[in-house]
Amino acid sequence: MLNLREYRARPAALADHLKWACLIAPGIVLNKDGSLQRTIAYRGPDLESSTPEELVAVTARVNNLLSRFGSGWALHIEADRRPSVTYPESTWRDPAAWLVDEERRAAFEEHGRHFETDCYLTLTWMPPADRTARIEQLFIDDPADAPAAFWTEHLAHFETETSRARDMMADLMPEARFLDDDETLTYLHACISVTRQTVRAPSLPMCLDALLVDTPLTGGLSPRLGEETLKILTINGFPAAGEPGILSELDQLGFAYRWVTRFLPLDKPEAEKTLNAYMRNWFAKRRSLTSYLREILTNEPATLLNTDADNQAADADEALQSLGAGHVAFGYCTTAIVVRHADASVAEDQIRAVERVIRGRGFTCVSESVNAVEAWLGTLPGEAYANVRQPLLNTINLAHMAPLSALWAGPERNTHLEGPPLLMARSASSTPFRLVTHQGDVGHMMVLGPTGAGKSVLLSLLALQFRRYAGAQVFIFDKGGSARCATLALGGTWYELGLDGDLAFQPFRDLGSEAGMAEAQAWVLGLVAQESVTVTPEVKQAVWTALQSLGAAPVTQRTLTGLVALVQSSELRQALEPYTLAGPYGALLDADEDSLATGDVLCFEMDALMQDKRLAPPVLAHLFSKLEARFNGRPTMLILDEAWLFLDHPMFAGRLRDWLKTLRKKNVSVVFATQSLSDISSSSIAPSLIESAPTRIFLANARAEEPSQQATYEAFGLNARQIELIARATPKRDYYVQCPDGNRLFDLDLGPVALAFCAAGSKADQKLISEILAASGPDGFAPAWLEARGLHWAADLIGTQGDVPCAAE
């Protein structure tokens, strides 16, 4: 099919050089030369978070995968570095949250273009000739086999082998999947076009070479693809020793490129034949013909040998031994990096940056000129003939230098909430990071780290950014007023739980239903048990009878004082009396109305409450019940700051364990934050915490590598390299996220507006917040606060929500 002489004397268009003919099965392309190809999209392990031992283990498993293939196969391993998605758009209901997000958008775009890397493995197989298959059938007689066309057998064999390869990749990589028809055509189109777009497979997917080409290729010493100049760098020399991810520094570059490593494996006999030829040639070069003649004439052994030839022969012999033992396979490897740009000088600068990285790792390379078009064609998936480099390479060296790993950028969308990521962050490289709280339908998260490392700032930012989701509500249990400013800026309500606060509860308001009665009884029994009253069946009956009588009263009379008047037992009356208006706690628990606001953002200050061990359990038990009634399927974030307060009490620990197991069904994400990892590891519910919170964010901790703390980090599944990253991170700037999808060290990159709202936890800030709140009221708090912090431009913008595209303007 490659012979075009019937139509034209020589190839005249880009389509003539392409091999892709048609789609014959899902994701499988039949090429013009009869070969089959299939592409796997994968995401390799994160080298930044891997220990040397883990890297060696991954290399060994990749070597096992690569050594499965023999003659007739071609492997194209590609890292496609592309521009990252733009900053996500959202519809905001809160001016302060909108302004913070616009500030973050401006900072994100100011840092220049961001890039991320997609990795692909294209497997190409050339079936044996039909006459070979016919000869095989002469020696194999299987009456159970129905006669079938050779091409169906070849297709079935190809599908089986590629599926096995995909399964092996899925075992050692976070993600590995076959491309479907549309994704395959989109990928092939991106290789030969300057325009990135989605390509839909036609109903009759034939003539793919003509279908996919929309950009002309101009040859010459400096070829052009459309209006963009192509620059190709080919590796032609290798260092003496390798290591896993030896070229991973290419993943840090701030421009787009295609890095393609093509491997043409050889069968064992063919590889042995080639290596034997190498060894014989080098062995013969150890001594010249003159030295042989001198040795014969003088009968004395030659003393001068070509040491380099001797070493090369020994190297070839060692390669033969590795091949014979089945440790490795050999093949021909071609590695090329392709960059393109409309400005030829920019393309030249980019290829020089690539060359500096490659030469810095001990490789030699050449910037293609005469061979540029041939080298570019050799990078196209399925092309096994163009630009073949002759030196043999074993599969371990291939695993070291191929693009088998990439920085994890995070998912582009929160699929569970059907929206954008929670927040965009940056890292040391040009690859951005997208934080998504959900793993499947589980949005629980743990935030762990020492005091003063930026925990409260992160929690406040999470609350602000979570408001990007439609119908989102945020409930915060705070300590020290850290989230007070963010809550008020969102138009929420901040409560100080305690006797001096402005919040009062009416626990028996909902006695009109059976559920309300049962809940009230459980609350009262917990109260009397705390007062050292033994809960017997008689006590339960007495409480139930009193509650039934109280339920018949008007709603405003369903108070704790009313319950005490209806209880017949003097012991129960004495136990309940401290919580009525006649006792010290009545102002908080014996109200005739419930003053808890119905807003979407509520914050409860726990500092004063938790100092009273007698008051905290009944107050929090009732408050938890009130909040659970609001968990109605809307996206909800429940933030528990300083969570050791909850772990310290059996009732709270049990409630937290139940929440982690059940609230995901109500679309609630529990964010559990604490300063001490030991509090969690020593808690009775530690297994539930670790299992139910798949996403964990660790704060910078310079003492993380100390033996006592290292053991605690290891209990959370961190390895030595990850602990080292946490120890080297900068407090209040760097955060390390760990989740099943990947790991990443990221920087929130907060601007002055975000810092004004999120970093306002000092006593001076609390005093200023109270003064501004008293002067401007809740509705005017956000602009007044920004004015007080000297951000006059931001205060002016906060009233123009939706009218300007970017806060920086």
Predicted features and spans:
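Conserved P-loop NTPase
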Residues: 716-772
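Hydrophobic anchor at the beta1->P-loop junction of P-loop NTPases
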Residues: 447
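P-loop NTPase motor domains
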Residues: 45, 52-68, 273, 277, ...
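A short helix-turn-beta junction within AAA+ P-loop NTPase domains corresponding to the substrate/partner-engaging
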Residues: 492-495, 685-699
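Extended, folded cores of ATP/NTP-driven motor/assembly subunits in large transport
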Residues: 1-409
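Walker A/P-loop NTP-binding active-site region of P-loop NTPases
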Residues: 453-506
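The conserved Walker
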Residues: 439, 451
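Conserved P-loop NTPase catalytic core
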Residues: 511-514, 691-715
